[in-house]
Amino acid sequence: MKKLLSIFSIAVMLFAFSSCENEEGHGYEIAGNIQIVSNNISFDANAQSGTVEVIAPGAVTVKCDAPWVTTSVDGSIINVTVTRNLSLEGRNAVLTIMSGNEKKNITVAQRGYVFDLDFGGATELKLGDAAFSKAYPCKSTLELEISTSASWLTAVYSDGKLTISAEENNTGNPRKGYIIYSFGPGSEEQTVSVMQCEKSDMYGDYYFAFNDGGTGALQYFPSTITGVNSDGEAGLFLQFNISSTDVMTLPLGWDDTNKVINITNAQFMGMYGSSYYMHNIVWDETSGYINYGVYNFQDAAVDVLDDGTVYAEIVDNGTWGSHIASSMMLYAFSGTPAEKDNKVGSLVRMIYPFLQKMQVEAAASPKAVSRDGKRMRKATISEADLVTYDPNLKW
């Protein structure tokens, strides 16, 4: 009898334990009671919608805390909508599906946008003056909005290509426009510059301007860039007077691919009076070093400012070792070529020299050049602030 009672007691305890387990589990997630039948909620970067179809034991509700995801429920279908992803990085959000006391999580994924415009390694287009049209590979996973800043420039995106067209430039001057693209409201506008320029566009009258190494004043020589020198030789030449009778001619190089003027150091430019052989000599105004070597230490990249002004800063091109070729001197020698043994002295010390084309049709107020660390920066000044240089021998 005792044995039978023990067995009965054990059975009651097992029944009680089993009942307690079921009661404790009530209200917690039970996997498998909400089933995902199908879903298409992995998106590219565009704003778009997808759905999740479920089988659930009761009415379905859904929750997602990500602000770029919105949801609605229509029976067993959950509608999911995402905004555009204006980041290169992908993003994920957790969608929590609930039915009664049960829930199930599923991930909403959206990839970052992809934009790839291939100019063959270049970051801007530098063209000749002839009419131009070319389609460039262009991949964008977001819809593009494209415009241009100039009537002579057009850009059309279609079938994975951006077709850029420019009308013939017959203005006689370099010109620059911009292709402006964005991914619609909320995205930042991006630009690609397109310049049309040939060597002949550089011909004309210029301010050959600089900060005077003695006074710091912004001054200039009225000058001309021409395609023929006084001896009838073809090329590119900068001509200017350093007195009423003495004309200097500085030979220039021309890089047509990059639209850059190359300046070779220590070129014989002409005579000052009957005794002095004038040369352009590169100068690091910080260290005080000068160099008599016949090398290309300085370049001047042609630019077109927003008002149409043609502008070229004469800057260091990195070939003078640790020295900075940001300035130059007009230097007198007792003969040519320029050598240490025949130097006489500097006539003009030119800090941050630049060329600015004089154009009637452009806002041609000269641009001041000043030092900001190692960088150059431009600021418009009035023409009254710019003084024609009146050279005085300083040696």
Q: Where are the regions a protein language model picked out?
A:
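Surface-exposed binding patches on compact interaction domains or structured appendages
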Residues: I36, N40, S49-T81, S133, ...
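Bacterial Sec-dependent N-terminal signal peptides
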Residues: V12-S42, G100-T107, R111, T191, ...
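Beta-sheet ligand-binding and adhesion/scaffold domains
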Residues: D256-W395
